[in-house]
Amino acid sequence: DLGIEGFWNDMNEPALFYSPERLKAFFENAAALSRKDNLDQNDFFGLVRSVMSLMNAPEDYRSFYHDTAAGRVRHDRVHNLYGGCMTRAAGEAFQTLRPGQRTLLYCRSSIIGAHRWGGIWLGDNHSSWSQLLANIQMMPAVQMCGFLYSGADLCGFSEDTTPDLALRWLEFGLFTPLMRNHADAESREQEFYRFTDVLPAIRNML
């Protein structure tokens, strides 16, 4: 017993496919930019978009197949099984190693039915009003799929949040069973106590 009472399963699904078509588009974009004397903001974000297009593209999910004992299966038909099987494996391991004890387990990717072993959070998001709205809309959907233990990265995982946006994230988070503030290393420090302008409102809500 190493004292481990829970797992946070992250990055538990195929995401980077590097398909020839998307790689070709990226290198063509990069080559075109390398010939320009002055790059502007649109050039930069255009390059970022071409990099981001290399991952999690639905077209890529449908473009390759798995050879199985039962025949060939297109990847998009089994994509969520990766997260679902990982959730089940971790949940059953806890039941074996810590029988009769409660455990903490939530995952990034999963499948309907896996809520019997663990919860889910909505994955990396951004510090923006549109992402806050998207997470508010997504939460009832995952809960109707059985994942009652669910939540989002409050304040946004990437980019810098603002005091007012952090306050609204907290208002949303108070209604989620998995309430956690989470950000990447490049974002501003966003613990709620850092937003002194809205601290009285934060304190009253908590």
Feature locations, PLM:
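Catalytic-domain carbohydrate-binding cleft regions of carbohydrate-active enzymes
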Residues: 1-206
